[in-house]
Amino acid sequence: MKKLLSTFVMVYIAATAFAQTVSFTSPNAESQKMLDSVKYVLPEFSAGMVIFNNGEQSNGALNINTIDQKLHFIDPSGKILVLSNNDQVARAFIKGRSFINSRYGYIEIYETSGEIFMGEVRKVGFISEDKQGAFGSKSQTTSIQTISSIQAGNGYMIDFEKQKNSPYTYKKTPYLCRKGIVQPVTKKVFIKCFPDKKEAIEKYISENDPNLNNVQEVREMFRAISK
């Protein structure tokens, strides 16, 4: 049964919200321009579909925020909203791209082999020696958030006006998944995913010395091993 996304319980968030890791420790005009370009996974909100754990589906103009790792969408009035029941989302398809919801965030699927898939999570995080001072005091749970702030996963409120010139990191992290179990990429995890190809995995690593934190190198290894 399909429903409009606007029929679900939602909360307002900022339209201008915000792991290989790129760090910007001295904010400047260029780093802030970069931040604007990576605060969402896709460059623009696009037609997509959400599939929930119970099998229900919803359609709308969607995108994925790289700070809160939640689906955002545009309602009929043009407001940017965040889906409050993101924990009930199983998958999302946006502009021909496929995403799996996991405890690590939304994983964009790049490679598949039967029940195994490989993908990446993109995340933006602020750098601070004192998170309490940078993010402010812990917030109370609320059904509606102000248009200038958003609650980070650590329970702190981020005020965009105060944080827009803060140092930050932009991180792309590869993941592997088998039988619904998602894990960061390691040699051991590769072998768990392809137990019958242990020798091939060890040989590939010995000959190519891939950086298992690099999305493209993991993708190439996945293709080679899954042949």
Please give the residue ranges for each predicted region.
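Sec-dependent signal peptide cleavage junction
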Residues: A19-V41
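Aromatic-patch recognition
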Residues: S58-V182
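Exposed beta-strand and adjacent loop surfaces of beta-rich binding modules
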Residues: T16, A47, K70
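Residues in well-ordered beta-strands of folded domains
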Residues: T7, I51, C177
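Short coil-to-beta-strand transition motifs
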Residues: I51-S58
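A short, Trp-centered hydrophobic/proline-enriched beta-strand micro-motif
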Residues: V41-I51
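A short, solvent-exposed beta-edge/loop patch
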Residues: Y156-N213, E217-E220, K227
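Bacterial Sec-dependent N-terminal signal peptides
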Residues: M1-T25, M221
